């Protein structure tokens, strides 16, 4: 199976970092593939790349950097070097999309260099760095996705975290090799209005990620917010 949704313009992938977590990573990937889904992985530096390539799974998204950030000269150089290494791994895995964040994330998803105030200079530097990332993607035939995060719960101090921020950066670069990874879990926590957000982002979206709020699961259905919007977001994506 290919993860295709009949009658829809999108395919479904499942994240191997979040499922079957009591199992070895390669087994998680195989279980997801056997269930008919495409596969997403995160940090490739801790993975057995050759084993993943031989697994038979279709890996469609992976982290596209190792360290660094978008704004500081040394951080941008690190990010671009890591992006080049990531592209080489993506080619080995035949993975079409590589994921980025507004800054490098460390232990527990916290930014390595927290930023409380993003300046105009930071915005200009971020666009310049992302232009170089997009150029790298164009040369390699891969698309980089810039993901929004939330600062209230999971990633405090992350610059360019809001969906509105990531969308603005993607639109400023204006390259088909840099798209938005619209994470509805993070967007619901940080901004809400998911349907309007999907409509606003439109063609800038390269990927949409879905997890329930709170807690990325459906244990507390009576408190869930994203689950009420998911069907309508899906219908809009299919129609679009």
PLM region descriptions:
Residues 1-96, 175-179, 231:
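N-terminal pre-domain/capping segments
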Residues 18-20, 43-45, 65-66, 102-106, ...:
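Active-site-proximal loop/turn and secondary-structure-junction residues that shape catalytic pockets
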Residues 25, 76, 80, 115-123, ...:
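Flexible, glycine- and charge-enriched loops at secondary-structure boundaries
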Residues 30-33, 62, 127-235:
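Acidic/histidine-rich catalytic cores of soluble enzymes
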Residues 38-39, 97, 207, 240:
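Residues at the N-termini of beta-strands
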Residues 57, 95-96, 142, 236-240:
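A short helix->loop->beta-strand "cap" motif at the edges of active sites that frequently abuts
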Residues 64-81, 104-122:
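Surface-exposed, active-site-proximal loop segments in enzymatic domains
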Residues 86, 90-115, 140-152:
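Active-site groove signature of glycoside hydrolases
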């Amino acid at each position: 199976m290919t993860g295709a949704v009949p009658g829809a313009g999108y395919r479904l992938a499942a994240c191997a970092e979040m499922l079957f977590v009591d199992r070895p990573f390669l087994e998680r990937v195989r279980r997801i593939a056997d269930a008919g889904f495409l596969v997403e992985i995160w940090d490739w530096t801790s993975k057995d790349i050759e084993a993943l390539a031989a697994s038979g799974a279709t890996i469609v998204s992976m982290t596209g950097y190792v360290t660094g950030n978008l704004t500081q000269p040394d951080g941008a150089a690190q990010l671009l070097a890591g992006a080049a290494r990531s592209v080489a791994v993506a080619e080995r895995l035949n993975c079409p999309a590589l994921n980025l964040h507004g800054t490098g994330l460390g232990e527990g998803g916290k930014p390595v260099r927290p930023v409380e105030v993003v300046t105009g200079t930071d915005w200009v530097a971020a666009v310049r760095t992302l232009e170089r990332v997009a150029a790298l993607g164009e040369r390699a035939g891969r698309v980089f996705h810039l993901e929004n995060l939330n600062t209230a719960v999971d990633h405090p101090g992350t610059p360019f975290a809001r969906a509105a921020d990531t969308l603005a950066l993607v639109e400023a670069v204006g390259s088909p090799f840099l798209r938005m990874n619209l994470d509805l879990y993070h967007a619901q926590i940080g901004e809400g209005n998911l349907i309007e957000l999907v409509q606003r982002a439109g063609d800038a979206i390269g990927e949409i990620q879905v997890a329930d709020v709170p807690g990325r699961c459906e244990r507390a259905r009576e408190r869930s917010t994203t689950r009420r919007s998911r069907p309508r977001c899906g219908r809009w994506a299919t129609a679009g």
